[in-house]
């Protein structure tokens, strides 16, 4: 039983192995068939894709080939067109050259004909010239025989006669040309000046020698006078200006020929009236303050003038000196306004003539700068102006314009001449100046200068319209006895050197002050 089971089991195993072998072989065969089928499919698909890629590449190559062919054909067409155009131009040039060649041939023929004719004429002229020379020699011999002069003598006599006639004609012609040129120059100058003057619109007010200070009421007049007149005397002594207190309601008149001192007095008095405290100590403070205010006004006036004329890079001290001209008059004409007017005129004239407008304006503005301090420094305003310009390193053209505008020296530039012309235009304008006021001021300045020429004199003020000269002396140098002697010496010199109507009162003021401060 056991053996039979074993045999059955062994037989079953063998049968299982055989069956498994055949099953596995069948499965393997099926897989191989599937693999071959898959490989065939992949190969077919690859061939299809390769065919497609090949077709696409062929199409792209055909398209590129077509584009290249079209571009090549286009370039060939353009080159053919350019060659055709060049050929046409060459043909045109060839035709032009042929025409020019024909013209040159014709001209050569004409020239040859003309040369032939000229040779014939030259032969005829030579023959006639020979005949004329023979006749001239015969005539000269006949003339020498008749006149008794040789040919050389006759020629010299004829030349002398012709020279005399030409000299007269030349003299007449030169005179006519000079007259014509002068008329043209005069006409042009008149047109130039007329145009320049019409372009300038300047306003001027005649300066006077008085200023008026309005008061809040007439009671203020008594306070200004002060106890026993000490306030008014202090103000007059410190400023050198006359205070006229009369029946004019609510007003005090300040009289003085020096506009700067008069402005200082006016400013101080206005401040005193506004402040209400009027006594000698306060008056001194206000006068000092007024001097500083007027200095600021002077500086502002100078800066405003340079700004108006558009002049730059001027030394600040020279600008301040220029501003002092606002308080200076010449024959009643404000000198600063006159200088501005001259600057404008000089600039316009320079522009018309093509000169440096800026330099001409600068020279015109500074031409009278010496008048700002001519009553303080010896010398004419021209000399003082030249020294100021040199001191503050002004341009040589400006210095010459200042020096030559009154004819003291010869002008060295066109600008100097233009400044002198502009100065004359401004001064000669109707109503610009008044002779009487200028003479009056010069007389008062001369009176002050004469009095200040003595040792120990600190300041001198001409007041009462020149009827009194008030001399302030140093108490350390002048005692009471010398004060009387000084007054007498000044009186004698005034009588000897000045001409004046009526009498002039000489007052010598000697004041000693002792000041201490309690701490």
From Swiss-Prot:
The enzyme's E.C. designation: 3.1.-.-
Subcellular compartments: Cell membrane
Annotated HD domain residues: 335-428
SMART domains xref list: HDc, KH
Molecular function in Gene Ontology: RNA binding; RNA endonuclease activity
Ligase recorded as keyword: no
Spans through the membrane: 3-23
Cellular component, GO, one term: plasma membrane
Residue ranges occupied by any KH domain in the UniProt entry: 209-269
GO biological process terms held by the UniProt record: mRNA catabolic process
Primary subcellular site in the record, as a coarse category: membrane
Pfam families reported for this sequence: HD, KH_1, RNase_Y_N
Function: Endoribonuclease that initiates mRNA decay.
Protein name (Swiss-Prot/TrEMBL): Ribonuclease Y
Lineage: Bacteria, Bacillati, Bacillota, Bacilli, Bacillales
């Amino acid at each position: 039983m056991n053996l039979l089971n074993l045999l059955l089991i062994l037989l079953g195993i063998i049968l299982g192995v055989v069956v498994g072998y055949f099953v596995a072989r069948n499965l393997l065969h099926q897989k191989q068939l599937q693999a071959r089928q898959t490989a065939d499919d992949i190969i077919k698909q690859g061939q299809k894709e390769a065919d497609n890629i090949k077709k696409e590449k062929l199409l792209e190559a055909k398209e590129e080939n077509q584009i290249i062919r079209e571009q090549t054909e286009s370039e060939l067409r353009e080159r053919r067109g350019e060659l055709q155009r060049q050929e046409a131009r060459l043909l045109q040039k060839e035709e032009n050259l042929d025409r020019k060649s024909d013209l040159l041939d014709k001209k050569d023929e004409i020239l040859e004909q003309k040369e032939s004719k000229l040779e014939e004429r030259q032969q005829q002229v030579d023959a006639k010239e020979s005949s004329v020379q023979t006749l001239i020699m015969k005539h000269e011999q006949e003339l020498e025989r008749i006149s008794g002069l040789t040919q050389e003598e006759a020629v010299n006599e004829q030349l002398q006669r012709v020279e005399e006639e030409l000299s007269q004609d030349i003299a007449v012609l030169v005179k006519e040309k000079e007259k014509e040129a002068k008329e043209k120059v005069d006409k042009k100058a008149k047109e130039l000046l007329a145009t320049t003057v019409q372009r300038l619109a300047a306003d001027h007010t005649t300066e006077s020698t008085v200023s008026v200070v309005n008061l809040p009421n007439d009671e203020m007049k008594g306070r200004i006078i002060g106890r026993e007149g000490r306030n008014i005397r202090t103000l007059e002594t410190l400023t050198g200006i006359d205070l006229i207190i009369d029946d004019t309601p609510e007003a005090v008149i300040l009289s003085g020929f020096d506009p700067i001192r008069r402005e200082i007095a006016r400013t101080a008095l206005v401040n005193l009236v506004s402040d209400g405290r009027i006594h000698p100590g306060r008056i001194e403070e206000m006068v000092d303050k007024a001097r500083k205010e007027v200095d600021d006004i002077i500086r502002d006036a100078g800066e405003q003038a340079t700004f108006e004329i558009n002049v730059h890079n001027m030394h600040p001290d020279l600008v301040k000196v220029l501003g002092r001209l606002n308080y200076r008059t010449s024959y009643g004409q404000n000198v600063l306004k006159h200088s501005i007017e001259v600057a404008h005129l000089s600039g316009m004239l320079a522009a018309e003539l093509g000169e440096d407008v800026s330099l001409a304006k600068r020279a015109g503005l500074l031409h009278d700068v010496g008048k700002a301090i001519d009553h303080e420094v010896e010398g004419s305003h021209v000399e003082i102006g030249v020294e100021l310009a040199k001191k503050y390193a002004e341009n040589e053209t400006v210095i010459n314009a200042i020096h030559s505008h009154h004819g003291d020296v010869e002008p060295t530039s066109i600008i100097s001449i233009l400044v002198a012309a502009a100065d004359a235009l401004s001064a000669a304008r109707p109503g610009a100046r008044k002779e009487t006021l200028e003479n009056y001021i010069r007389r008062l300045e001369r009176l002050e200068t004469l009095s200040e020429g003595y040792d120990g004199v600190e300041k001198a003020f001409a007041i009462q319209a020149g009827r009194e000269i008030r001399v302030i002396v140093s108490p350390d140098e002048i005692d009471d006895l010398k004060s009387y002697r000084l007054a007498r010496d000044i009186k004698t010199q005034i009588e000897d050197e000045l001409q004046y109507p009526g009498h002039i009162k000489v007052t010598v003021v000697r004041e000693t002050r002792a000041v201490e401060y309690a701490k």
